[in-house]
């Protein structure tokens, strides 16, 4: 989500729709991304067909700044995402072209081999110290190597860090002198 922060901030004066996200949206996290709580709209659907219909309506209306859609994550679906048919993807792509709405579709990595009408398709994978962004499909020349994006300090600081103890000997507390022992006994 942090990758989308600049784009979402640019449209934060309009509604930002989160359609069937895998987890309940966290207001503080959305605020950190630049989305005011009043601009966030969380939509859930019981069936994938209902979610696809809602996505198409949001895109065609042009009334929202952005649509973030996780297809197959309906309230009655299993833990595994259901695939979206190619004709449904084509309809969403056409609706996105007609409207003035940013459209982000989040799908599992297993679907990166499937065809899609989207002009830009990215794969995001964790990497030590950041993330690797793969270019599945883009306009222009093919890029084989993923783009490494380091994580900012603020996100790594939030996680507990394990650090080894220094190898030098720690000072041992001094033993109380006889005079101090006498004072303690008195």
What are these regions (language model features)?
Residues 1-186:
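N-terminal regions of ATP-driven nucleic-acid and macromolecular assemblies
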């Amino acid at each position: 989500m942090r990758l989308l922060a600049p784009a979402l901030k640019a449209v934060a004066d309009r509604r930002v729709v989160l359609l069937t996200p895998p987890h309940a949206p966290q207001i503080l996290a959305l605020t950190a991304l630049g989305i005011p709580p009043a601009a966030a709209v969380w939509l859930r659907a019981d069936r994938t067909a209902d979610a696809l219909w809602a996505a198409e309506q949001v895109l065609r209306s042009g009334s929202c700044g952005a649509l973030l859609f996780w297809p197959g994550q309906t309230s009655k679906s299993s833990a595994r995402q259901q695939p979206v048919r190619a004709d449904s993807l084509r309809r969403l792509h056409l609706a996105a072209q007609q409207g003035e709405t940013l459209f982000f579709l989040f799908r599992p990595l297993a679907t990166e081999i499937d065809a899609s009408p989207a002009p830009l398709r990215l794969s995001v994978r964790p990497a030590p110290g950041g993330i690797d962004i793969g270019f599945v499909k883009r306009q222009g020349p093919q890029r084989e190597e993923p783009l490494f994006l380091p994580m900012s300090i603020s996100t790594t600081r939030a996680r507990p860090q394990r650090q080894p103890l220094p190898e030098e000997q720690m000072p041992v507390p001094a033993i109380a002198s006889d005079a101090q022992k006498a004072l303690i006994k008195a």
